[in-house]
Amino acid sequence: MGIALMFLLALYQMQSAIHSEIIDTPNYAGNSLQDADSEVSPSQDNDLVDALLGNDQTERAELEFRHPISVIGIDYSKNAVVLHFQKHGRKPRYKYDPELEAKRRSVQDNFMHFGKRQAEQLPPEGSYAGSDELEGMAKRAAMDRYGRDPKQDFMRFGRDPKQDFMRFGRDPKQDFMRFGRDPKQDFMRFGRDPKQDFMRFGRTPAEDFMRFGRTPAEDFMRFGRSDNFMRFGRSPHEELRSPKQDFMRFGRPDNFMRFGRSAPQDFVRSGKMDSNFIRFGKSLKPAAPESKPVKSNQGNPGERSPVDKAMTELFKKQELQDQQVKNGAQATTTQDGSVEQDQFFGQ
């Protein structure tokens, strides 16, 4: 059996070699326009031409090649037909099937469908024998989509078609890469209220960024202080203060660097300096003139109290002692000077 098969293959190869021989030197004169009375050009010494033209059918010639022809060209300079063969061609179709070609070129035959049948190959509707439920099950089975709805997108495994691509068991309302979080929350928010800004942990959304336990009315980085930053002991509302209390203004009723005192009415006005400036604990109101003198002084204006007399005596004694010490020091200095003069003249 093997020898017979090899013999048949050898015969087929020889036949193919004979039929696929191409003329190397074509007859240019044979294709040229000549008069009808001219003689026919002599035949060439070619076995293939002799075999083809040996019979009476000179008007028709048929050639068979091993490879299919991909391109047919004409060389007008040589008056020849140029054939380009396709070595790795498709498998020959012995019969053209227009339905198969239409199915192959169908738009519904999408690329990268693995294990699924084409829509054209499905049985027509109404051919299912049974109820509507069985018909739907047969349709899904025929689609061969592994128990999934054909409306799902490509490469979706057991997920709801409403979900976006690459979502595994998550709600489609959630954004991409959100794991078990509320879709109202922003990206990368873990257990926080969606009204809060980014990177806010347990704070109300009314507060500004980086505020810890403070009211939103306070400015940035204010810890338990009033609205007016760096104002100590003053009213927190500038708009509610009187114009007399403008900070860092000199020559106004609100005296700068005054502690516990009220503003005088004539502070640095008309070139007059107030006596209470930079004085601590002094009353602004001057002492009222005494309308009634002391009773002890009304009767005897010349008499003094015993305390005044004692103080006067003490001051007098102190002055006398100081005068005596001063006189003694002057006398000692005079004596020393006279002794030095005597010694100088004695020498």
Swiss-Prot record:
Single Gene Ontology BP term? adult locomotory behavior
Propeptide spans which residues? 23-102, 235-240, 283-347
Q: Which residues carry this modification: Phenylalanine amide?
A: 114, 157, 168, 179, 190, 201, 212, 223, 232, 250, 259, 280
* Cleavable signal peptide: 1-22
Question: Any keyword Secreted?
Answer: yes
Q: Name one GO cellular component term.
A: extracellular space
Q: Where is this region: Disordered?
A: 283-347
Q: What is its main location?
A: secreted
User: What function is annotated for this protein?
Assistant: In insects, FMRFamide and related peptides have modulatory actions at skeletal neuromuscular junctions, and peptides that are immunologically related to FMRFamide are released into the circulation from neurohemal organs.
User: What is the protein's name according to its record?
Assistant: FMRFamide-related peptides
Q: What is the lineage of its organism?
A: Eukaryota, Metazoa, Ecdysozoa, Arthropoda, Hexapoda
